[in-house]
């Protein structure tokens, strides 16, 4: 853990990689317990949080409002990274919604992990940063329609209805209150949910293109403009259980049936990369996609946990 971060984490120059690294450690803590997690990864988390807080990342700036800012106008910096003519098809830039949801979650989780250690100053600083982040998250992203803007920059708020807002509800620690969480989740249910994943863009939004077909350039434009992604559905189902608890167990169970059926098509026993956003929801892209498989498997384990309560 004493090595530089660049020696430990692949693609550290991507703004969200460190945030997802903290999330991955958080999942390990659920399995192994906080004490063992702290012994194994505590120093790494300490280094990651300081790396971000000290503004040492080349494209992840912690602003005075407690929110993270990344420049993505000319180069794609999020998972929506398709390009056309050397430019991002979806130029998400500035305050990006899932970056800041992940940031709040990272602050809260790390503070809790270090709560019983001697580093009280570190914990107090994390808690203070989390409060500032939470105080400014909803005013920045939550709009008058009851969902989250996808990104905000220089006074502009992007109102495209995209699935990136689901992370603010699904993660263990949310900067939103209960009413806001329910509203965001319900928006995802109404406009983004399909039997094969969450759409990358609502059919009501400008530029909706649900069919991943045609030559490469045409597919690049459609890649994040309406296609459905199962790994996002994993977080959606987790959010359903977090907001509605036991009353959504049967609903989530029914959603999983669609993925069970998919195991007998394309590549037997696995799930393809993405699906068309409109019926009949044909599977497209790579015939097997690890993020989708792991996302659905995680929900299956989560269902087992709820069923055993």
Which sequence ranges carry the predicted segments?
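Catalytic cores of carbohydrate-active enzymes
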Residues: 50-53, 57-65, 69, 102-212, ...
């Amino acid at each position: 853990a004493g090595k530089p971060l660049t020696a430990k984490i692949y693609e550290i120059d991507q703004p969200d990689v460190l945030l997802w690294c903290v999330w991955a450690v958080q999942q390990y803590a659920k399995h192994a317990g906080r004490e063992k997690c702290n012994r194994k990864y505590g120093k790494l988390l300490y280094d990651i949080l300081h790396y971000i807080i000290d503004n040492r990342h080349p494209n992840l700036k912690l602003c005075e409002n407690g929110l993270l800012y990344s420049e993505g106008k000319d180069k794609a910096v999020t998972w929506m990274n398709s390009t056309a003519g050397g430019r991002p098809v979806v130029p998400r830039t500035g305050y990006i919604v899932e970056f800041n949801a992940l940031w709040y979650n990272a602050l809260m989780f790390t503070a809790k992990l270090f709560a019983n250690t001697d580093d009280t100053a570190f914990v107090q600083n994390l808690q203070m940063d989390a409060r500032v982040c939470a105080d400014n998250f909803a005013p920045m992203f939550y709009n008058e329609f009851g969902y989250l803007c996808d990104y905000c920059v220089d006074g502009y708020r992007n109102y495209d209805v995209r699935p990136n807002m689901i992370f603010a509800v699904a993660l263990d620690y949310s900067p939103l209150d209960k009413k806001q969480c329910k509203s965001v989740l319900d928006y995802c249910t109404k406009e983004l949910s399909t039997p094969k994943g969450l759409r990358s863009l609502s059919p009501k939004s400008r530029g909706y293109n649900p069919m991943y077909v045609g030559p490469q350039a045409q597919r690049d434009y459609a890649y994040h403009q309406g296609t459905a992604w199962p790994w996002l559905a994993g977080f959606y189902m987790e959010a359903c259980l977090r907001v509605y608890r036991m009353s959504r167990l049967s609903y989530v169970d029914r959603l999983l049936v669609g993925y069970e059926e998919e195991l007998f098509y394309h590549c037997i026993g696995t799930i393809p990369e993405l699906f068309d956003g409109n019926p009949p929801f044909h599977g497209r892209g790579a015939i097997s996609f690890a993020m989708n498989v792991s996302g659905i498997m995680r929900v299956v384990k989560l269902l087992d946990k709820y069923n055993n309560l």
